[in-house]
Amino acid sequence: MASRAGPRATGTDGSDYQHRERVASHYQMSVALKSEIKKLNIAHAVVWFLVAAQVLVSQLNLVSHKVVASPYQWEYTYLLSIIPTVFSFMALPKNNISYLVISMISGGLFCIGPILYGGMEMFPVAQQLYRHGKAYRFIFGFSAVSIMYLVLIISVQVHGWQIYYSKKLLDAWFTNTQDKKKK
């Protein structure tokens, strides 16, 4: 294809792509991981909002305890799990390593810890439900223990992936800083 001024100059026919600069892989990985972490943070915020709504509705007696059961003990400590998500959101825009590390550590403490405790706290009630078919706590007509175990399963996956992707992102950021120190 020729230009208005005549034939193209040699070397501009598109075959010179091998000499062009490319985006370093750790930058590409950083963008992809940030996107995944943002999605997981939003998923966690939704789960957190649902747990917070149940605790708030129950504590303020907005509806009968027959409609929304009183919260389990682990749900109160799980409300602290918004802290790692806030630090994660603060870490992503400027690649702040300190905030990301705080998010990962507090994620284990405030997210995974209450979930493990909740699984153990609700186990006898779940065992009674599945052995004898008796449930004493309900959330909108459904067994509270079944709903809360579903919340636990979703939360474990969300927080596990958050910590995993945060670790991968941290590795990508450290690769970036190591490359800068070498120059």
Swiss-Prot record:
What InterPro entries does the database record attribute to this sequence?
Jagunal (IPR009787)
What this protein is reported to do is described as: Endoplasmic reticulum transmembrane protein involved in vesicle-mediated transport, which is required for neutrophil function.
A Gene Ontology CC term for this entry?
endoplasmic reticulum
One biological-process term from Gene Ontology?
defense response to fungus
Q: What is this protein called?
A: Protein jagunal homolog 1-B
Keywords (alphabetical) are: Endoplasmic reticulum, Immunity, Membrane, Protein transport, Transmembrane, Transmembrane helix, Transport
At the highest ranks, the source species' classification is:
Eukaryota, Metazoa, Chordata, Craniata, Vertebrata
In which compartments does the protein localize?
A: Endoplasmic reticulum membrane
Q: Which organism is it from?
A: Danio rerio
Q: How does it sit in the membrane?
A: Multi-pass membrane protein
Q: Which domain of life is it from?
A: Eukaryota
Record topology, Lumenal segments:
61-71, 121-137
Topological domain, Cytoplasmic: which ranges? 1-39, 93-99, 159-183
The record's family statement is: Belongs to the jagunal family.
Sequence intervals crossing the membrane: 40-60, 72-92, 100-120, 138-158
